[in-house]
């Protein structure tokens, strides 16, 4: 558990690149990917190295991509897939916006705490937009405050369980649960 005092002010928790590499072993994606909360580029770099055309944006510039872009206020449709680890305090809003932004048949993959499955407001989100697949990581993957992975590893890793939540715009079936890692 974190108190407000322990949280990073802008909710910047970089994702371990291994999480993106594992995702690419689970799913195929459109040639065009938008990483809309790119932070320091941890995920974007993995997708670029795998040959994808990656649009990297973030509200706060952290040395990678285009800063000053508030994803929740963007108006354009995206003819590609969206993959990100959103700021957790706005995760529900990021999911809704991403699904509404990608064109039909395109994917939205969000790296989220497994506790994202809880809650009445998110239940309504899942009823309106059922994920096609939730990939549960059976080993702990890291999200490090301010990209401080070394400090996190020295401290024993993470007590938080994560997974990849995958939506397809237009999908309205049952959610499949799979394990990886």
PLM features per residue range, with description:
Residues 1-181:
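Class I S-adenosyl-L-methionine-dependent methyltransferase catalytic core
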């Amino acid at each position: 558990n974190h108190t407000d005092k322990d949280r990073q002010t802008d909710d910047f928790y970089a994702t371990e690149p291994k999480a993106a590499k594992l995702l690419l072993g689970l799913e195929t994606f459109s040639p065009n990917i938008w990483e809309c909360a790119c932070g320091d580029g941890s995920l974007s770099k993995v997708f670029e190295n795998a040959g994808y055309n990656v649009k990297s944006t973030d509200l706060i510039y952290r040395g990678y991509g285009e800063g000053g872009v508030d994803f929740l206020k963007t108006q354009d449709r995206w003819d590609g897939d969206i993959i990100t680890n959103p700021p957790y305090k706005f995760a529900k809003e990021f999911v809704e916006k991403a699904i509404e932004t990608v064109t039909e048949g395109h994917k939205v993959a969000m790296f989220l705490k497994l506790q994202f499955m809880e809650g009445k407001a998110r239940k309504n989100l899942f009823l309106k937009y059922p994920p096609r697949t939730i990939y549960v990581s059976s080993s702990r993957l890291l999200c490090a405050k301010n990209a401080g992975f070394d400090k996190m590893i020295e401290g024993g890793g993470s007590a938080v369980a994560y997974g990849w939540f995958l939506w397809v715009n237009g999908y309205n079936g049952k959610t499949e649960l799979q394990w990886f890692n």
